[in-house]
Amino acid sequence: MIKKENLDKTSAWPFVEAKKMLRERKSFIEKKGKITLQTGYGPSGLPHIGTFGEVARTSMMVNAINQLTDLPTEIITFSDDMDGLRKVPDNVPQRDLLEKNLHKPLTQVPDPFNKFDSFGEHNNEMLKNFLNSFNFKYSFKSSTFLYKSGFFNSSLQTILKNYDGIMNIILPTLGKERQ
């Protein structure tokens, strides 16, 4: 915790970035009434030091924001568990089971550990246990659950209505091979 009188002077990166975010997104933050930061997790493998680092850095930002403002904060840890299984990790049992399910969404791939309904669910639980062991404060969100619940429907409809305009913006930013 930094003393209030030193907050303006600190050059620690979480405070520099938090001040920048509060300044640049002031009207949006005031309208929303809270600040939400998000981390992402691709559950095709077990949580690792990179996963820890992303949540730790985001938690440092929240700590800085909490010292700079009284607005409520939240960290969402978002699991991209609808991603396809691209390769079989070396550190799992029943690798042949996973081989048969390459390119399927992780929540449709059987759990090689035989503990959960899917490999995605297994790794999501591993992630939550991992983060909980370090007392991180977060809200967990699964892309599978959110898509199935219709959470993204209105946004997806907006994208479809504006498809041509969106493509006119995105395509020029891509290399020829990705267009």
Labelled PLM ranges:
Residues 76-83, 143:
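Short, solvent-exposed turn/loop segments enriched in Gly/Ser/Thr/Pro and often Arg
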Residues 94-134:
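A glycine-rich helix N-cap at a beta->alpha junction
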Residues 5-7, 43-52, 106-118, 144-146:
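The substrate-binding groove and active-site-proximal loops of carbohydrate-active enzymes
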Residues 132, 136-179:
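Active-site cores that bind ATP or allylic diphosphates and position pyrophosphate for catalysis
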Residues 1-49, 63-77, 93-103, 129:
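Non-catalytic terminal extensions that flank enzyme cores
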Residues 50-61:
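Active/ligand-binding-proximal structured segments within catalytic/core domains
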Residues 45-47, 82-86, 148-151:
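Short catalytic/ligand-binding loop motif for oxyanion handling, primarily in non-cytosolic enzymes
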